[in-house]
Amino acid sequence: MAFSYCSSSLFVSLLLVILFISPLSQRPSVKAENHLISEICPKTRNPSLCLQALESDPRSASKDLKGLGQFSIDIAQASAKQTSKIIASLTNQATDPKLKGRYETCSENYADAIDSLGQAKQFLTSGDYNSLNIYASAAFDGAGTCEDSFEGPPNIPTQLHQADLKLEDLCDIVLVISNLLPGSK
């Protein structure tokens, strides 16, 4: 009988713990709300991606314009690095010399875009917002140049096309922010 009481007591205790912990683990995801985000995103070419990107980190809610600029550069740079890996994989798989050459062009464009975003971050930190704009534009152009290298067959793979558009959209967020920063042209 003591075993039965002990078992049921343990069962009730475990049930209470599970009931207590379960609602805590099912918290809805935190969405960053920042009035600056609602000012920035409608000015971009892809407002929904802008909202998704800038609201993806709860810390965005407390960031000022410069902080959101830093965050958007980081997101764009991460996207460019991921696309570089995709391009390297496509290059390794390519047997058509023309296609391989196009991938190599894209690889160079993305290496330049990553470098440009690194420079943009430094200019943001130093307060040189005009140079920030120039380097963010250069990163934007890198994705576009990759895209342009696929005029005519063989066509650009969908995965790379989408990655090019995404980098352009993310760089556009940086450009909008750079134009909103005080002292920019």
UniProtKB/Swiss-Prot annotation:
Kindly name one Pfam family recorded for this protein.
Answer: PMEI
Location relative to the cell: Cytoplasm
Q: Alphabetically list the UniProt keywords.
A: Cytoplasm, Disulfide bond, Signal
Q: Which SMART domains match?
A: PMEI (SM00856)
Question: What are the GO cellular component annotations?
Answer: cytoplasm
Q: Which Gene3D superfamilies match?
A: Invertase/pectin methylesterase inhibitor family protein (1.20.140.40)
Propeptide residues, per UniProt?
Answer: 185
One Gene Ontology term of the molecular function aspect: pectinesterase inhibitor activity
Q: Which domain of life is it from?
A: Eukaryota
Keyword check for Signal, yes or no. Answer: yes
Q: Which family does it belong to?
A: Belongs to the PMEI family.
Q: NCBIfam families from the xrefs?
A: PME_inhib
Gene from which this protein is expressed: PMEI
Q: What PANTHER family has UniProt attached to this entry?
A: PECTINESTERASE INHIBITOR-LIKE, PLANT INVERTASE_PECTIN METHYLESTERASE INHIBITOR SUPERFAMILY PROTEIN
| Keyword Disulfide bond belongs to the record | yes
Q: List the disulfide bonds.
A: C41-C50, C106-C146
Instruction: Write the protein's name.
Output: Pectinesterase inhibitor
What's its job? Inhibits pectin methylesterase; may be involved in the regulation of fruit ripening.
Q: Where is the signal peptide?
A: 1-32
- Tissues showing expression: Fruit.
